[in-house]
C-alpha cells in the first residue's frame, strides 16, 4: 500500500536559462532552474503576494531563484509546512518533454517512488560508480504522451549532467554546466526528508511556469556531433 510522505517538490524555470553542454562526442541543450523541496502536503505554491483569500493561511519563505531572492507563498492542504530545501534543477531542452505549469484545475502532479532499473543500468553501463541504484520518483497523471499515445515516462532522478536526461528532471548543485555527484546527494537528501526511501511512497510536484521546450535551444543543432 502506498504511503504519503508529506513532501512537495516545487519547480521553477523562470527566467528561462539554457546552455550547450558537451557530453562525449555530442552537445546537448540543458535547461536550468530551481527546485524547492517542502516538508508538507501543499495545495498551492506561487510567487505572489498573499491576496485576501490567502492572507491568513499558509507560509511565506524567501528562496533564491535565477532572478534573485523571491517570496514563495505556500498553502498546505492539511497539516503544517516545515523546512524548505533548495536545489538547482536540470532538464533536457531542444524539443524534449517538459512538464506544463500546474493550474487551479490541476494544482499538482502526484509522485510515486520506485526503483527504476533502466536508470540504474544506464549508470552502471556508463561507468558511474557512485549512484543510488535507480531510486527515483515517477511523475503521475501528467498530459505528456508518447507517439503511440501512452503517457510518457517522466522521472525525478539523479543526473551528473544533461546527457543522462531525456524528459526527466534532476536536482543538484550546478558546477559550471554539470551537477557531478551533487545530484546523487540531492536525491538522498530528499529521501531523508521523507523518512528514508521505500518503493511506492507518495509525494507531490508543483510546476510554477512553462518550460517552452521547443524554443529552448542553445546548441546550433540538438545533439550535434563535435
Please describe what each predicted stretch is.
Residues 1-181, 185-203, 210-226:
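Cell wall/extracellular polymer interaction/catalysis modules
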Amino acid at each position: 500500500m502506498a504511503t504519503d510522505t508529506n513532501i512537495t517538490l516545487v519547480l521553477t524555470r523562470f527566467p528561462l536559462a539554457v546552455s550547450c553542454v558537451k557530453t562525449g562526442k555530442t552537445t546537448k541543450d540543458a535547461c536550468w532552474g530551481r527546485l524547492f523541496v517542502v516538508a508538507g502536503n501543499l495545495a498551492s505554491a506561487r510567487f505572489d503576494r498573499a491576496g485576501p483569500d490567502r492572507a491568513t493561511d499558509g507560509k511565506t519563505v524567501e528562496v533564491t531563484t535565477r532572478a534573485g531572492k523571491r517570496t514563495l507563498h505556500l498553502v498546505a492542504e492539511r497539516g503544517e509546512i516545515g523546512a524548505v530545501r533548495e536545489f538547482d534543477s536540470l532538464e533536457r531542452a531542444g524539443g524534449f518533454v517538459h512538464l506544463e505549469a500546474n493550474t487551479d484545475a490541476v494544482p499538482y502532479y502526484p509522485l510515486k517512488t520506485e526503483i527504476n532499473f533502466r536508470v540504474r543500468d544506464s549508470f552502471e553501463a556508463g561507468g558511474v560508480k557512485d549512484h543510488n541504484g535507480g531510486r527515483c520518483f515517477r511523475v503521475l497523471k501528467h498530459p505528456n504522451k508518447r507517439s503511440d499515445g501512452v503517457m510518457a515516462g517522466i522521472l525525478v532522478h539523479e543526473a551528473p549532467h544533461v546527457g543522462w536526461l531525456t524528459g526527466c528532471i534532476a536536482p543538484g548543485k550546478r558546477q559550471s554546466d554539470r551537477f557531478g555527484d551533487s545530484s546523487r546527494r540531492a536525491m538522498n537528501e530528499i529521501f531523508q526528508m521523507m523518512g528514508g526511501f521505500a518503493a511506492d511512497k507518495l509525494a507531490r510536484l508543483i510546476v510554477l511556469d512553462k518550460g517552452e521546450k521547443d524554443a529552448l535551444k542553445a546548441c546550433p543543432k540538438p545533439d550535434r556531433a563535435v
